[in-house]
C-alpha cells in the first residue's frame, strides 16, 4: 500500500530536522511501514559510501539505519561538498559530477532538479512511505527561485509539511511566525503542523504559549520534543558532541583541521567506558593526550600547511618521538606521509608539499575519486572494514612498514617502525567489528585501567534509535501525522 510522503522543514539550520526525521523513520519502521528517507540536496563534508560505491550524506545514512535498510544513492541524490577558494564539489546520484565555483550554482539548477525528481521517483517505486527532509531554513526568499531541497521537494512529492523549530536557541515564536509569513499562500497550505524541538523545562508551563502560537498561525503545534542526551550522529561538525574528560581514563585528542571531513570516524570511540574525545585547537592540547587522531580533510594540502604554520607539525613529531599513539585517517594518513604531489591541480595551485614524514608513503593526487566499501586485513590477520573516499594513491616507500592490505594486495594502511604511528584510508574503521575496542583496551592495559567489553556498536545505535522513537511517541501527536500520510 502506498502512502503520501511526509516532509520535515526547518525554521533555520541546525534546528534538529535530521534527528526528527530519523525519529519519524524509526517510528514508521516499528509500525510496519516500508519506509525510507530522502533529502534532495545536502551540503556537507560528512559523507558515506554505499555498498554500490556511491557517495551520500551521513544524515540519510543515519535515517536509513533507523529504517533498518541499506543506504542508497537515491536517498540523497545531490551532495555538495564545499572546498577551498569558494569551490564546491557536486556529487549527483553518488558520483562526482563536477567541481564548480559556488556562485555558478544557478547554472546547474535545472539539471539538479531533474536528477532530484528522477531519484524521488526511483525511491518511491521501491518503498511505500518516504520521509522527506529539507535543508536549512525553508523561508529563504532570496533562494526561492533555485530551491531544490525545501518547498520545491514538497511540491514535487505533493507532501504535507511539518515545520521544526528550535526553542533552545531562543526566539522560537518569532522564527515560527516569521517563517510562516514568508511562505507563499500555496506553500503555507502545505504546512500541517509544527514541532518545537530541544525544549528544557516542564511542558505544562509552556502549554499557554503553544495555544497562542496556534491562534496566530492557524496551524496546530503537534508537540514539544525535549532536549535529550541521546547519542545520535549529527550532520555537521559544528554540533558534534564530544565527551569531555575528568582527568581519568583514555584521553583522545582530535586535531581540528580547518577543512576537516568525516568527523563521525571517531564517534564510536566516545561511547567506550573511560574514554574521552576532544578537539585539539592548538599544539599544547596534544601534550596530555594518550592518543592523537588526524582526521580526514577536504583540502589535504591546505590543512598540511596549516599544521606547519600553527606549530602542530613540531608538536606531532615531538609527541611521536615520545612513543605517543598517533592515528591518521584518509587525509590524515596522507598528511603523515613523506610527500603529497598534486601535479594536476586537483586541490589547487600547490603542486607538491612535504608531509610530516612519520609514515613511509608518497601520495599523488589524480582526477579520479575512489569511493568503495572495503574489507581488509592487518598484519596479524585481523579483519578491518569501512569505506574509502579519496583522490589519489599512496605508494609505500618502505614495504616492511605496510600495516593493512586488501586480499588483492592493495595497501590501505601503514605504520612506522616503532609501531606508534598508524595511518589508513579506511573511514569507519573504529565502527565495524572490534578493532576500536581492541585498540582502546591496549591503551588501557598500558595505563593500568580496567579493560572494557562494550556492546556492539550497531546494537548500540539501534538502542539509541529506539529511545529516540519513544521520545517521539511520548511527546508528539503521531496519530495526527499518520492521518496525514493516508490518501
UniProtKB/Swiss-Prot annotation:
All residue ranges annotated as the GATase cobBQ-type domain in the record: 249-435
Pathway the protein contributes to: Cofactor biosynthesis; adenosylcobalamin biosynthesis
One MF annotation (Gene Ontology) recorded for this entry: catalytic activity
Highest taxon, organism lineage: Bacteria
Entry-linked Pfam families: CbiA, GATase_3
Record protein name field: Cobyric acid synthase
One of the protein's GO biological processes: cobalamin biosynthetic process
Stored InterPro entries: Class_I_gatase-like (IPR029062), CobQ/CobB/MinD/ParA_Nub-bd_dom (IPR002586), CobQ_GATase1 (IPR033949), CobQ_N (IPR047045), CobQ_synth (IPR004459), GATase_3 (IPR011698), P-loop_NTPase (IPR027417)
Record-stated family: Belongs to the CobB/CobQ family. CobQ subfamily.
Keywords assigned by UniProt, alphabetized: Cobalamin biosynthesis, Glutamine amidotransferase
Function: Catalyzes amidations at positions B, D, E, and G on adenosylcobyrinic A,C-diamide. NH(2) groups are provided by glutamine, and one molecule of ATP is hydrogenolyzed for each amidation.
Active site: 330 (nucleophile), 427
Organism: Clostridium perfringens (strain SM101 / Type A)
